[in-house]
Amino acid sequence: DELEKQTGQPLEEVCIAAAGRVLKTVTTHVEYEYAQESVVTGEDVHTLDLLGIEKAQEAFKEVNDTSYKFYCVGYSTVKFFLNDEVFISLEGHKANKIGEDIIVTFLPEDVVDGLYAAVGQAGLSVANMTLEPIAAINVAIPENYRMLNIALVDVGAGTSDISITRDGSIIAYGMIPH
């Protein structure tokens, strides 16, 4: 109520950043080959992301040694590839084949459901969910500084979040419980 009064705007949706001691990540590579040379669109890049997430989910199912059901809660593209060459961005370029290295993150169903329940109890709904290490690095380290090899450690009350950059990309992230 106080935020609504201060801003003069009703709050209905929130974006949340999840922490989790049981965070699991999978890094994978995915490619898509066009029938003929094409200009890469934003939709093509989004499709590539979805293919990467799907491939990571399949890989995670094979190694998941718990009885927990996990949800994909975030992902980051490490590198894009255009005709097997590393590119910063794919959109607008002509290509026969596109690809990406992608990090996909999973949290147990009960953690995700608990976050959604807490937001619901506040009379709000979730508009977007990410992970604390992804949110922290996006706020603290602009993309042009990610060419440096940087490790960002966000020390919190329950977990410390770690994000690592190299060659312009987030190459790893995770959480360490206290």
Regions found by a protein language model. Name each.
Residues 1-14, 18-151, 169-170:
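Nucleotide/phosphate-binding catalytic cleft detector across ATP-hydrolyzing
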Residues 25-27, 163, 174:
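Amphipathic coiled-coil signal-relay and dimerization helices
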Residues 107, 175-176:
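Residues that cap or flank secondary-structure elements
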Residues 18-21, 152-159, 165-168, 176-178:
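A short acidic Gly-Thr/Ser loop motif
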